[in-house]
Amino acid sequence: MIVYWQSTRKGQRLILSDDDNEINEEVGGVRETKRGFDAFAKTFGYEPGRAQKGIPTMEEAKEFVELLKPWELFSGGDGLAVDPLVRSAPE
């Protein structure tokens, strides 16, 4: 399993992928808005603390998501670290 950031048109998505790259699950994301960056970490319930708006920089928004470790909610996600390389979106 691997966790990595993937570029999108208005931000980045945090992806949990299996080793064969057959299963790709979005576990978080950051998008640019007029007021800064909005960030969220996926959850299986209602947890408003897993989303934040108006973060000043992309790096701070990504750090917010990574600190919540949303990939650990999924089987096989324990103990993983985020790959520092941002990947482009598949075409």
Question: Which residue stretches match the model-derived regions?
Answer:
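Short N-terminal "domain-start" leader segments
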Residues: 1-40, 82, 86-90
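Mixed-charge, Lys/Arg-enriched low-complexity segments
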Residues: 36-91
